[in-house]
Regions:
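C-terminal helix-rich "cap/oligomerization" subdomain common to oxidoreductases
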Residues: 1, 6-7, 27, 66-69, ...
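Hydrophobic residues in well-ordered beta-strands that form the structural core
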Residues: 53, 92, 117-119, 148, ...
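Predominantly a Rossmann-like dinucleotide-binding segment in NAD(P)-dependent oxidoreductases
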Residues: 123-217, 340
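Rossmann-fold dehydrogenase core element
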Residues: 105-123, 142-146
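N-terminal Rossmann-like dinucleotide-binding module
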Residues: 1-47
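Active-site loop of classical SDR/Rossmann-like NAD(P)-dependent oxidoreductases
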Residues: 12, 291-304
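Beta-loop-alpha module in the N-terminal Rossmann-like domain of NAD(P)-dependent dehydrogenases
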Residues: 49-109
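Contiguous beta-strand/loop segments that form the cofactor/metal-binding neighborhood of enzyme cores
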Residues: 189-270, 300-314
Length: 346
């Protein structure tokens, strides 16, 4: 049995972490902490456990084995490192942290304390993405030559706990990034996972097109971005993100391989389609991708993966020691946009 505490009680905790822990038979929820105590109390009332007065009280509770870190991006590293140093296993929300140095310090703290540190890169776990990875590794359709992927929705203000344009997601000191990292890390990590290689270079442009604070001033981070990337093995393609896709969420990935075109979540019935070089199509009906509209459903797989990795003391597909290499692309995107140039990734 894994005894867990949850730090930060916004929407991602309520709709995903707490809900999925609650439905895992190997978990006991010990309690919650949030700076707004009423949020913590509401989740304790719904899912069980108690409310902690401070984050230190929670991470120093000897009855807690592991924690979820679901605070604003700027506090991921500080909170995670405190928890690891207190002897807790940690599942941290994405993006991992706001600088490479923070990410490295998190990984180092996990190693020093011999604790598991996983990052919520849930797209690695969808049945379609996992099967796509398997197909690519078999070589049945050849290697990936190029790719296109996009992720867009109407913005975090409709999803966040405040339901307001005053959300921390729009503030640079709390979020550090905009759509490029909030959404882009999902796709930057996914493509790296599928291609099976590390990025070589990136050119990124990030803009504010539509989002405003309640007083009418533009938000402090991007609401749209476009990235052109190349892998060390030569694979080349684009990642685009948007918080201004109004109507329905859009997530589509296309991989152009030596022997066909692989389409992921492009068709409402078949989540994976490969149009082969002879024009015939292999179609696979696997799943429907989870969106922010799919609230309170125990289906992301992240919590189950975290719990089993800790209880079985095994490596995980979500280990921070690997995800940090995807974060290198995020930081290179920031540099590229700021310097208006292509950036080579070490």
């Amino acid at each position: 049995m894994l005894k867990v505490g949850l730090i930060g009680c916004g929407s991602i905790t309520k709709q995903r972490h707490a809900y999925e822990y609650f439905h895992n038979d190997n978990v006991e929820i010990k309690g919650f902490f949030d700076l707004r105590q009423e949020r913590a109390q509401a989740l304790a009332d719904e899912f069980g456990g108690k409310v902690y007065a401070t984050v230190e009280d929670l991470i120093n509770d000897p009855e807690i084995d592991a924690v979820s870190v679901c605070v604003a991006n700027a506090y991921h590293a500080e909170t995670t490192i405190k928890a690891l140093n207190a002897g807790k296993h940690v599942l941290c929300e994405k993006p991992m942290a706001t600088t490479y140095e923070e990410c490295k310090a998190m990984v180092d703290a996990a190693v020093k304390n011999n604790k598991h540190l996983l990052i919520d890169q849930n797209q690695r776990l969808t049945p379609t993405h996992k099967y796509a990875k398997e197909l690519i590794e078999t070589g049945k359709y050849g290697k990936v030559i190029s790719f296109q992927t996009t992720f867009g929705h109407g913005g975090p203000e409709s999803w966040s706990a405040d339901k307001s344009a005053n959300t921390w997601f729009f503030k640079k000191d709390k979020a550090a990034f905009g759509s490029m990292a909030d959404l882009g890390i999902h796709k930057l990590d996914l493509i790296r996972y599928l291609v099976g290689d590390d990025y070589k270079s990136v050119y990124s442009k990030q803009v504010v097109l539509d989002k405003k604070f309640p007083d009418g001033t533009p938000i402090e981070v991007d609401d749209n971005s476009a990235e052109v990337l190349q892998f060390k093995n030569g694979a080349f393609g684009t990642v685009t993100t948007s918080w201004t896709v109004y109507g329905e969420e859009v997530q589509v990935t296309t991989l152009f391989l030596e022997k066909g075109i692989m389409k992921l979540y492009a068709d409402p019935e078949y989540s994976l389609i490969v149009v082969k070089d002879n024009g015939e199509a292999d179609k696979y009906k696997l799943d429907v991708i989870q969106t922010n509209d799919d609230v309170q459903q125990a289906s992301s797989g992240v919590i189950d993966e975290f719990v089993s990795a800790v209880l079985e003391d095994r490596n995980s597909i979500l280990d921070a020691s690997d995800i940090i290499n995807s974060m290198k692309a995020v930081f290179a995107c920031v540099e590229s946009n700021n310097e208006k140039k292509e950036v080579v990734i070490d």
